[in-house]
Amino acid sequence: MRSRPCYIPARMLRTLWAALFSVVSTITFSTATIILVFVRAPAHLVERVINIWARSIVWAAGIELKAEGTELLDPNQRYILVANHYSYFDIPCIFAAIPQPIRFLAKVSLFKIPIFGWAIARAGFIPIDRKNRRTAVKSFDMAAQRIRKGNTIVVFPEEGRSRERQMRPFQRGGFLLALKSELPIVPVALNGTYDVFRAGAKTITPGPVTVTVTPPIPTVGRSLKDKESLAQESRNRIGRILFGESFAENDAPTKDEEQKDEG
Protein backbone atom coordinates (compact mmCIF):
# COMPACT_ATOMS: atom_id res chain seq x y z
CA MET A 1 0.00 0.00 0.00
CA ARG A 2 1.47 3.31 -1.08
CA SER A 3 1.67 6.01 1.56
CA ARG A 4 0.01 9.33 0.89
CA PRO A 5 2.30 12.26 0.12
CA CYS A 6 2.66 14.72 2.98
CA TYR A 7 1.63 18.21 1.94
CA ILE A 8 2.64 21.17 4.06
CA PRO A 9 0.23 24.10 3.68
CA ALA A 10 1.74 27.18 2.03
CA ARG A 11 0.81 29.30 5.03
CA MET A 12 2.76 27.01 7.35
CA LEU A 13 5.78 27.16 5.05
CA ARG A 14 5.59 30.95 5.06
CA THR A 15 5.42 30.94 8.86
CA LEU A 16 8.42 28.62 9.20
CA TRP A 17 10.39 30.70 6.71
CA ALA A 18 9.49 33.98 8.44
CA ALA A 19 10.35 32.55 11.86
CA LEU A 20 13.75 31.28 10.73
CA PHE A 21 14.55 34.49 8.88
CA SER A 22 13.44 36.61 11.85
CA VAL A 23 15.72 34.70 14.22
CA VAL A 24 18.73 35.12 11.93
CA SER A 25 17.93 38.77 11.23
CA THR A 26 17.38 39.58 14.89
CA ILE A 27 20.64 37.95 15.97
CA THR A 28 22.55 39.71 13.18
CA PHE A 29 21.17 43.19 13.76
CA SER A 30 21.19 42.84 17.55
CA THR A 31 24.88 42.02 17.40
CA ALA A 32 25.46 45.00 15.13
CA THR A 33 23.59 47.26 17.56
CA ILE A 34 25.64 46.06 20.53
CA ILE A 35 28.87 46.72 18.63
CA LEU A 36 27.77 50.19 17.49
CA VAL A 37 26.76 51.21 21.00
CA PHE A 38 29.99 49.78 22.46
CA VAL A 39 32.20 51.78 20.07
CA ARG A 40 30.03 54.88 20.61
CA ALA A 41 29.03 55.11 16.97
CA PRO A 42 26.84 58.05 15.89
CA ALA A 43 23.21 57.64 16.95
CA HIS A 44 21.95 57.75 13.37
CA LEU A 45 23.84 54.52 12.61
CA VAL A 46 22.04 52.73 15.44
CA GLU A 47 18.72 54.06 14.14
CA ARG A 48 19.60 52.86 10.65
CA VAL A 49 20.33 49.34 11.89
CA ILE A 50 17.03 49.23 13.78
CA ASN A 51 15.15 50.42 10.69
CA ILE A 52 16.77 47.81 8.44
CA TRP A 53 15.96 45.08 10.99
CA ALA A 54 12.32 46.18 11.11
CA ARG A 55 11.99 46.28 7.33
CA SER A 56 13.54 42.82 7.03
CA ILE A 57 10.97 41.37 9.47
CA VAL A 58 8.11 43.05 7.62
CA TRP A 59 9.40 41.69 4.31
CA ALA A 60 9.83 38.15 5.63
CA ALA A 61 6.23 38.08 6.85
CA GLY A 62 4.91 39.12 3.45
CA ILE A 63 3.49 42.36 4.80
CA GLU A 64 2.64 45.05 2.26
CA LEU A 65 3.32 48.08 4.43
CA LYS A 66 1.75 51.46 3.81
CA ALA A 67 2.32 54.58 5.91
CA GLU A 68 -0.16 57.45 6.01
CA GLY A 69 0.13 60.83 7.72
CA THR A 70 3.85 60.71 8.50
CA GLU A 71 4.18 64.16 6.94
CA LEU A 72 2.38 65.46 10.05
CA LEU A 73 5.47 64.72 12.14
CA ASP A 74 8.13 67.41 12.48
CA PRO A 75 11.55 65.72 12.16
CA ASN A 76 12.91 68.13 14.78
CA GLN A 77 10.14 67.43 17.31
CA ARG A 78 9.77 64.43 19.60
CA TYR A 79 6.45 62.85 20.50
CA ILE A 80 4.60 60.31 22.61
CA LEU A 81 3.06 57.89 20.11
CA VAL A 82 0.11 55.83 21.35
CA ALA A 83 -1.08 52.89 19.26
CA ASN A 84 -3.44 49.93 19.31
CA HIS A 85 -1.75 46.56 19.82
CA TYR A 86 -2.77 43.38 17.97
CA SER A 87 0.38 41.57 16.95
CA TYR A 88 4.08 40.92 17.39
CA PHE A 89 4.44 42.68 14.02
CA ASP A 90 3.13 46.00 15.37
CA ILE A 91 6.59 47.00 16.58
CA PRO A 92 8.56 46.36 13.35
CA CYS A 93 5.75 47.99 11.34
CA ILE A 94 6.00 51.17 13.44
CA PHE A 95 9.79 51.24 13.14
CA ALA A 96 9.62 50.73 9.38
CA ALA A 97 6.85 53.27 8.78
CA ILE A 98 7.62 56.21 11.06
CA PRO A 99 10.76 58.34 10.44
CA GLN A 100 11.60 59.11 14.07
CA PRO A 101 14.26 57.85 16.53
CA ILE A 102 11.79 55.62 18.36
CA ARG A 103 12.06 53.75 21.64
CA PHE A 104 9.45 51.47 23.17
CA LEU A 105 8.36 50.60 26.65
CA ALA A 106 8.84 46.82 26.35
CA LYS A 107 7.83 44.04 28.70
CA VAL A 108 10.67 43.09 31.00
CA SER A 109 10.88 39.47 29.76
CA LEU A 110 12.20 40.66 26.38
CA PHE A 111 15.33 41.98 28.08
CA LYS A 112 16.13 38.45 29.28
CA ILE A 113 16.48 37.08 25.74
CA PRO A 114 20.18 36.50 24.93
CA ILE A 115 21.67 38.95 22.42
CA PHE A 116 18.32 40.59 21.59
CA GLY A 117 17.73 41.62 25.20
CA TRP A 118 21.27 42.93 25.50
CA ALA A 119 20.83 44.92 22.28
CA ILE A 120 17.58 46.63 23.22
CA ALA A 121 18.92 47.45 26.68
CA ARG A 122 22.03 49.10 25.24
CA ALA A 123 20.03 50.89 22.56
CA GLY A 124 17.91 52.59 25.21
CA PHE A 125 14.66 50.63 25.16
CA ILE A 126 12.76 50.77 28.43
CA PRO A 127 11.78 47.66 30.44
CA ILE A 128 8.41 47.76 32.15
CA ASP A 129 6.80 45.30 34.53
CA ARG A 130 3.17 46.38 34.74
CA LYS A 131 2.51 43.91 37.55
CA ASN A 132 4.89 45.83 39.80
CA ARG A 133 3.69 49.38 40.33
CA ARG A 134 6.98 50.60 41.82
CA THR A 135 9.10 49.41 38.89
CA ALA A 136 6.48 50.64 36.42
CA VAL A 137 6.83 54.16 37.81
CA LYS A 138 10.60 53.83 37.47
CA SER A 139 10.12 52.81 33.82
CA PHE A 140 8.26 56.02 33.07
CA ASP A 141 11.09 57.96 34.73
CA MET A 142 13.49 56.19 32.35
CA ALA A 143 11.21 57.11 29.45
CA ALA A 144 11.48 60.76 30.46
CA GLN A 145 15.28 60.42 30.31
CA ARG A 146 15.08 58.94 26.81
CA ILE A 147 12.93 61.89 25.74
CA ARG A 148 15.59 64.30 26.98
CA LYS A 149 18.12 62.39 24.87
CA GLY A 150 16.01 63.00 21.77
CA ASN A 151 13.83 59.92 21.39
CA THR A 152 10.17 59.60 20.51
CA ILE A 153 8.48 57.13 22.88
CA VAL A 154 5.86 54.59 21.78
CA VAL A 155 3.28 53.37 24.27
CA PHE A 156 0.65 50.66 23.80
CA PRO A 157 -1.98 51.92 26.27
CA GLU A 158 -4.04 48.72 26.05
CA GLU A 159 -1.12 47.10 27.91
CA GLY A 160 -0.88 43.90 25.90
CA ARG A 161 -2.01 42.41 22.62
CA SER A 162 -5.74 42.02 22.19
CA ARG A 163 -7.07 38.64 21.02
CA GLU A 164 -10.16 40.37 19.63
CA ARG A 165 -10.41 43.17 17.07
CA GLN A 166 -12.15 45.31 19.65
CA MET A 167 -9.84 47.68 21.52
CA ARG A 168 -9.68 47.59 25.28
CA PRO A 169 -9.79 50.78 27.38
CA PHE A 170 -6.60 52.85 27.31
CA GLN A 171 -4.55 53.02 30.50
CA ARG A 172 -3.30 56.42 31.59
CA GLY A 173 0.46 56.02 32.14
CA GLY A 174 1.57 57.15 28.68
CA PHE A 175 -0.67 60.20 28.81
CA LEU A 176 0.73 61.23 32.18
CA LEU A 177 4.21 60.92 30.65
CA ALA A 178 3.16 63.20 27.79
CA LEU A 179 1.68 65.77 30.15
CA LYS A 180 4.71 65.80 32.44
CA SER A 181 7.15 66.07 29.52
CA GLU A 182 4.86 68.49 27.62
CA LEU A 183 5.32 66.49 24.43
CA PRO A 184 2.58 66.22 21.81
CA ILE A 185 0.59 62.98 21.79
CA VAL A 186 0.22 61.26 18.42
CA PRO A 187 -2.45 58.54 18.14
CA VAL A 188 -1.34 55.90 15.60
CA ALA A 189 -3.66 53.28 14.10
CA LEU A 190 -2.27 49.89 13.08
CA ASN A 191 -4.69 48.33 10.62
CA GLY A 192 -3.99 44.84 9.26
CA THR A 193 -1.61 43.29 11.76
CA TYR A 194 -4.55 41.48 13.39
CA ASP A 195 -5.15 39.65 10.11
CA VAL A 196 -1.46 38.94 9.54
CA PHE A 197 -0.70 37.41 12.95
CA ARG A 198 -3.04 38.13 15.83
CA ALA A 199 -2.45 37.04 19.42
CA GLY A 200 -2.91 33.28 19.66
CA ALA A 201 -2.44 32.65 15.93
CA LYS A 202 -0.32 29.68 14.81
CA THR A 203 0.43 30.80 11.26
CA ILE A 204 1.19 34.05 9.44
CA THR A 205 -1.21 35.30 6.77
CA PRO A 206 0.67 37.71 4.46
CA GLY A 207 -1.27 40.84 3.60
CA PRO A 208 -1.51 44.63 3.72
CA VAL A 209 -0.85 46.68 6.85
CA THR A 210 -1.48 50.41 7.09
CA VAL A 211 0.13 52.58 9.76
CA THR A 212 -1.89 55.79 10.04
CA VAL A 213 -0.46 58.78 11.90
CA THR A 214 -3.02 61.32 13.13
CA PRO A 215 -2.38 65.00 13.90
CA PRO A 216 -0.41 65.66 17.11
CA ILE A 217 -2.39 66.65 20.20
CA PRO A 218 -0.62 69.48 22.11
CA THR A 219 -0.11 69.04 25.85
CA VAL A 220 1.57 72.33 26.76
CA GLY A 221 -0.59 74.23 29.22
CA ARG A 222 -2.76 71.25 30.10
CA SER A 223 -2.98 69.76 33.59
CA LEU A 224 -2.52 66.19 34.77
CA LYS A 225 -6.29 66.00 35.18
CA ASP A 226 -6.55 65.98 31.38
CA LYS A 227 -5.13 62.46 31.16
CA GLU A 228 -8.64 60.96 30.99
CA SER A 229 -9.82 63.15 28.12
CA LEU A 230 -6.54 62.69 26.24
CA ALA A 231 -6.78 58.91 26.56
CA GLN A 232 -10.36 58.95 25.31
CA GLU A 233 -9.62 61.30 22.41
CA SER A 234 -6.67 59.14 21.33
CA ARG A 235 -8.70 55.93 21.54
CA ASN A 236 -11.57 57.49 19.60
CA ARG A 237 -9.26 58.64 16.80
CA ILE A 238 -7.74 55.19 16.43
CA GLY A 239 -11.13 53.49 16.71
CA ARG A 240 -12.65 55.59 13.93
CA ILE A 241 -9.79 54.68 11.61
CA LEU A 242 -10.08 50.97 12.40
CA PHE A 243 -13.87 50.64 12.63
CA GLY A 244 -15.34 53.71 10.96
CA GLU A 245 -17.10 56.83 12.17
CA SER A 246 -19.66 54.71 14.01
CA PHE A 247 -17.03 53.79 16.61
CA ALA A 248 -18.45 54.71 20.02
CA GLU A 249 -16.55 56.20 22.94
CA ASN A 250 -17.77 53.43 25.21
CA ASP A 251 -17.05 50.70 22.66
CA ALA A 252 -14.82 48.71 24.99
CA PRO A 253 -15.06 45.23 26.48
CA THR A 254 -15.82 44.82 30.15
CA LYS A 255 -13.34 43.14 32.46
CA ASP A 256 -15.19 39.84 32.00
CA GLU A 257 -15.05 40.14 28.21
CA GLU A 258 -11.39 41.06 27.94
CA GLN A 259 -9.09 38.43 26.55
CA LYS A 260 -5.55 39.49 27.16
CA ASP A 261 -2.25 38.07 26.06
CA GLU A 262 0.82 39.40 27.86
CA GLY A 263 2.62 40.11 24.58
Language-model features and meaning:
Residues N84, A121-A123, T203-P206:
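Short, hinge-like loop/turn segments at secondary-structure boundaries
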Residues I57-A60, L81-V82, R130-R134, R163-R165:
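Short, flexible loop segments at the rims of nucleotide/cofactor-binding pockets, characterized by
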Residues R14-F21, I50-A106:
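Conserved H-X4-D acyltransferase segment
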Residues Y88-K138, M142:
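Membrane-embedded segments
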Residues A54, F125-D129, G160:
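Short, basic, glycine/proline-bearing loop/turn elements
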Residues R2-P5, P9, V137-G263:
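Non-catalytic C-terminal accessory region of glycerolipid acyltransferases
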Residues R4-K66, W118-R122:
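A transmembrane-helix-recognition feature enriched in membrane-embedded lipid enzymes
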